[in-house]
Regions:
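Active-site loop segments of alpha/beta catalytic cores
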Residues: 1-161
Length: 161
């Protein structure tokens, strides 16, 4: 596909979404409350495997690696547990994942992960201008077109506090 000019997007799920498929989430949430050290080890193990998976995607030519942990949003976890998750896993994981970003590969974060990082003060939002040389009569850039133009210009790890 890449040889034909297509852009490759590889989607990766976070640990809460993965665990949500394997076991009842109430046990994960209970573990986070009662045994945070154990959950930290579990999340670290999953994070290591997810990063290895992302690295393989990059090596195979993925232009974009999209990370989402939809089960980890504030609307599901609540503010206190969402903050715990950011401190326990998400912040360090995103910093490591950001190291995979370069002029060939861009790391995309789902809005829930982004807002969790912003809400805990672990990241800041930077408004990026994209030059669009089309006339005003034409449609504006799509999200995909904007991502393609941004690739290689903004590295994720530089965006975390």
């Amino acid at each position: 596909m890449y040889e034909k000019g297509e852009h490759i997007v590889f989607e990766v799920s976070g640990p809460l979404t993965i665990l949500n498929v394997l076991i009842d989430p109430k046990y994960v949430f209970k573990g986070m409350r009662k045994k945070p050290e154990l959950m930290a080890r579990i999340f670290a193990k999953l994070g290591k495997e997810i990063l290895a998976y992302m690295k393989l995607a990059k090596e195979q030519g993925a232009d974009f690696i999209s990370y989402a942990d939809s089960s980890g949003g504030v609307n599901i976890l609540g503010p206190k547990m969402a903050e715990q998750m950011v401190n326990l896993f998400t912040y360090d994981f995103v910093k490591q994942a950001g190291k995979l970003a370069d002029e060939h590969t861009m790391i995309l974060l789902c809005p829930k992960t982004t807002f969790a990082l912003l809400g805990t003060g672990k990241a800041k939002l930077i408004d990026c201008q994209i030059h669009d040389d089309r006339s005003q009569e034409e449609d504006s850039l799509s999200y995909a077109e904007a991502c393609i133009r941004m690739k290689g210009k903004y590295v994720l790890q530089d965006r975390c506090a």
